[in-house]
């Protein structure tokens, strides 16, 4: 296997002094042995409110550098926040490129009718790492016809 496909050492910078003091608790971590996503926490000093239908940008207090163009990180909503409280990501999915080195910021959108409160170091999102395929393109005049060919949305029906 090619080296770039097996290198999964991600560099992390701790930007929040409280995280530095207790990094084993505040760093991204898997909640259970079977978890796919690493929990990301709100690096805030005091409780903040997120009014109904509003969007807010919340810092995590960390920065990562993936440094491998064949790996990317996806920031996803936490299922409980979305289902129970109507809190999802403002951009639906966050894409962290391998060369990005800035602080991870979480765009939270309150789609509920109620004010939502975020406490310091609440788990607000999750992050997964996925492999990336970087294709090359070949310019052609025509495609070899398939059964589907150019049929678009809904072409196969619902049953």
From Swiss-Prot:
The keyword Transferase is annotated on this UniProt entry = no
One Pfam family of this chain: dUTPase
Q: Keywords assigned by UniProt? A: Hydrolase, Magnesium, Metal-binding, Nucleotide metabolism
Return the broad EC class: hydrolase
What GO biological process terms are annotated to this protein in UniProt? dUMP biosynthetic process; dUTP catabolic process
Q: Which cofactor does it need?
A: Mg(2+)
Binding residues for substrate, per the UniProt record?
78-80, 91, 95-97, 105
The pathway that the record names for this protein is:
Pyrimidine metabolism; dUMP biosynthesis; dUMP from dCTP (dUTP route): step 2/2
Q: So what does this thing catalyse? A: dUTP + H2O = dUMP + diphosphate + H(+)
User: Recorded E.C. number(s)?
Assistant: 3.6.1.23
GO molecular-function terms, A-Z: dUTP diphosphatase activity; magnesium ion binding
Known role: This enzyme is involved in nucleotide metabolism: it produces dUMP, the immediate precursor of thymidine nucleotides and it decreases the intracellular concentration of dUTP so that uracil cannot be incorporated into DNA.
Family that this chain belongs to: Belongs to the dUTPase family.
Q: Which protein is depicted?
A: Deoxyuridine 5'-triphosphate nucleotidohydrolase
Per the UniProt record, the source organism is: Buchnera aphidicola subsp. Schizaphis graminum (strain Sg)
- Name of the encoding gene: dut
């Amino acid at each position: 296997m090619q080296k770039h496909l097996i290198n999964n050492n991600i560099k992390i910078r701790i930007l929040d002094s409280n995280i530095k003091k207790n990094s084993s608790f505040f760093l991204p971590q898997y909640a259970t042995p079977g978890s796919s996503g690493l929990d990301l926490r709100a690096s805030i000093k005091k409780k903040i409110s997120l009014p109904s239908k509003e969007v807010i940008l919340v810092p995590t207090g960390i920065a990562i550098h993936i440094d491998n163009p064949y790996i990317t990180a996806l920031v996803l909503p936490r299922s409980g926040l979305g289902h129970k409280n109507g809190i999802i990501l403002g951009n639906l999915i966050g894409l962290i490129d391998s060369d990005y080195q800035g602080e991870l910021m979480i765009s939270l959108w309150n789609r509920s009718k109620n004010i939502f409160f975020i406490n310091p170091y609440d788990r607000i999102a999750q992050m997964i790492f996925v492999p990336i395929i970087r294709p090359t393109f070949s310019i052609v005049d025509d495609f070899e016809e398939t059964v589907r060919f150019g049929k678009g949305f809904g072409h196969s029906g619902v049953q």
